[in-house]
């Protein structure tokens, strides 16, 4: 059998007996008989090629590179001075190690291309020299003027190089007509035209209290600690100084990757993405590149984030976990981040809370170690900006804890804020500027707080009553993810558009839910977002009319941030709590003591002195009970079916991995009881179809207040008058359209009407 090399490279040509004059081309002399045929050269094998291209090198002449030890690994348990090699093979000959290095190939392609170009030019010259015919004389362009395709290809700019130069490009962005915002002209501060146009485009005609006080100090390079109620514009209070610093550092193009001008840290992914959106809106008219502001958060592709960081963005917005993960993978990235000018802590109390976000403390340590001590143009420490709505120690305590509270006020002075932060941070200034825009408020004065007293099993009923009577955009907070998952099908069955967001969802699902909820709010449609406390901090969702606390929050600071999701940007809103009698006697009373105004300090406060009871129409509540009961059964059946399928699949996978047969005898008693409870809640297809049909008929019936009325014109606010004027409630006959905020402001009787 022939070798495969011979099969591939040898070609046998048979020539038929044809006359010589009919053969194509010139005839070739046939080799004489008995002459030796030329030997066919066999191709080199892979091993032969490697031997030819490699050489043995002594160990001391190799290109050893020192290994940089990451900070998180400390000192490799005592090892130091480690070096590494790349592209070296080790061969053992007679027990001795030999280092084999590949020889560098000579780059002959360039020489070939140059020779080809020379030959082409010579051919062109030869053609031009021929002047045998008298053609009309025309002006001809010089060869240098003609476009050279090859040179064009060589001069084609690289996209990565353009992005790597700087986050800012040296061209002026197209600006709209001159805009004048005189109220943004603060003392000793003149904002750039780019920023002014960005503010005008977003509709911010005047600064808020925290912005008016913090921006001038931040632009002067001072450390700032800002405290203000939720929804007061803290993002722009540090965002505008950062953008102005970036514009001031605008330089010519360079090939080096520049360090970020500012690093902004946020406790949640959603808050980080929101900060990026706000910064991009303000920087819309500035010469900021497409990837000038980058978010570094978990739940998204880490490879894409590494690529964006390689282009040297000017502003980084990060969550501590993903930022630390990227820093541990690259020492070059740490060195670049350590040269930043500004570090911002948004929702700083959460970032620095004991037992939380240990990653952030590690990040600060790594940046401190790698920041150069004496470098021209780099100060010893970076500028630090700290912002939050809550800084009190008492606000973080659990409301269910019965330990005696400090007799001092829950409001803390500036000195105490400094002592709290100095233990965690190292400021550049000895005395950072502390700004308290709302010293006597924790919850914004634009938020009207309300209470609904109900039993633990009646939360669903009263929540549905509230959503039905007061349509609009509502954000419902629950303490448990299971409650979030159950409320979504419960309200969906009642024809209420409902979305959900919780920590078990992947990042893309969270962002999609937020986008849909925002879109519904922008169209003034009724929509509900059921959320865990992952959405409590920092999220700026426009046009939220109500915040409903399905469960009382576990700590006072969570209540403050939950309530701050409404009444933003100067608007008003409602925060309503659904409270059981057990909660009212303990956690609710403690919550009110912590959050109440300082005017009540030291006085014996009535539980309802600053929280109004929401008026309840008990006649309507009774009519809603059948709907709620059916919807609860359908929702429980859906949740139990999903839970049962998940547990079954998990048990099967575990049994297959162990190689055992899954039998009922080996199932744990607790799992068996849980399965029995779930099976009891699961409805058959016929039962579910019957209940859905019954619920549909109930939903098609419009509620009627005070059913004993027999005539359309009976009562002061009669039904006929409301139908003619169009003031009738969409879901309830005989009930006027009313908003929860207006209802609470009227100061109606707090007793439930019967």
Swiss-Prot record:
<feature type="compositionally biased region" description="Basic and acidic residues">
    <location>
        <begin position="103"/>
        <end position="118"/>
    </location>
</feature>
<dbReference type="InterPro" id="IPR027417">
    <property type="entry name" value="P-loop_NTPase"/>
</dbReference>
<dbReference type="Pfam" id="PF00271">
    <property type="entry name" value="Helicase_C"/>
</dbReference>
<feature type="compositionally biased region" description="Acidic residues">
    <location>
        <begin position="119"/>
        <end position="132"/>
    </location>
</feature>
<feature type="region of interest" description="Disordered">
    <location>
        <begin position="103"/>
        <end position="168"/>
    </location>
</feature>
<keyword id="KW-0698">rRNA processing</keyword>
<keyword id="KW-0067">ATP-binding</keyword>
<comment type="function">
    <text>ATP-binding RNA helicase involved in the biogenesis of 60S ribosomal subunits and is required for the normal formation of 25S and 5.8S rRNAs.</text>
</comment>
<dbReference type="GO" id="GO:0006364">
    <property type="term" value="P:rRNA processing"/>
</dbReference>
<feature type="domain" description="Helicase ATP-binding">
    <location>
        <begin position="215"/>
        <end position="409"/>
    </location>
</feature>
<dbReference type="InterPro" id="IPR050079">
    <property type="entry name" value="DEAD_box_RNA_helicase"/>
</dbReference>
<dbReference type="InterPro" id="IPR000629">
    <property type="entry name" value="RNA-helicase_DEAD-box_CS"/>
</dbReference>
<dbReference type="GO" id="GO:0005829">
    <property type="term" value="C:cytosol"/>
</dbReference>
<feature type="domain" description="Helicase C-terminal">
    <location>
        <begin position="460"/>
        <end position="619"/>
    </location>
</feature>
<dbReference type="InterPro" id="IPR001650">
    <property type="entry name" value="Helicase_C-like"/>
</dbReference>
<dbReference type="InterPro" id="IPR014001">
    <property type="entry name" value="Helicase_ATP-bd"/>
</dbReference>
<keyword id="KW-0378">Hydrolase</keyword>
<dbReference type="GO" id="GO:0003724">
    <property type="term" value="F:RNA helicase activity"/>
</dbReference>
<dbReference type="GO" id="GO:0003723">
    <property type="term" value="F:RNA binding"/>
</dbReference>
<keyword id="KW-0694">RNA-binding</keyword>
<dbReference type="GO" id="GO:0005730">
    <property type="term" value="C:nucleolus"/>
</dbReference>
<keyword id="KW-0690">Ribosome biogenesis</keyword>
<dbReference type="InterPro" id="IPR014014">
    <property type="entry name" value="RNA_helicase_DEAD_Q_motif"/>
</dbReference>
<protein>
    <recommendedName>
        <fullName>ATP-dependent RNA helicase MAK5</fullName>
        <ecNumber>3.6.4.13</ecNumber>
    </recommendedName>
</protein>
<dbReference type="Pfam" id="PF00270">
    <property type="entry name" value="DEAD"/>
</dbReference>
<dbReference type="GO" id="GO:0016887">
    <property type="term" value="F:ATP hydrolysis activity"/>
</dbReference>
<comment type="similarity">
    <text>Belongs to the DEAD box helicase family. DDX24/MAK5 subfamily.</text>
</comment>
<keyword id="KW-0539">Nucleus</keyword>
<feature type="short sequence motif" description="DEAD box">
    <location>
        <begin position="346"/>
        <end position="349"/>
    </location>
</feature>
<feature type="compositionally biased region" description="Basic residues">
    <location>
        <begin position="21"/>
        <end position="40"/>
    </location>
</feature>
<feature type="binding site">
    <location>
        <begin position="228"/>
        <end position="235"/>
    </location>
    <ligand>
        <name>ATP</name>
    </ligand>
</feature>
<feature type="compositionally biased region" description="Basic and acidic residues">
    <location>
        <begin position="138"/>
        <end position="150"/>
    </location>
</feature>
<dbReference type="GO" id="GO:0005524">
    <property type="term" value="F:ATP binding"/>
</dbReference>
<feature type="region of interest" description="Disordered">
    <location>
        <begin position="17"/>
        <end position="61"/>
    </location>
</feature>
<feature type="short sequence motif" description="Q motif">
    <location>
        <begin position="184"/>
        <end position="212"/>
    </location>
</feature>
<keyword id="KW-0347">Helicase</keyword>
<dbReference type="InterPro" id="IPR011545">
    <property type="entry name" value="DEAD/DEAH_box_helicase_dom"/>
</dbReference>
<keyword id="KW-0547">Nucleotide-binding</keyword>
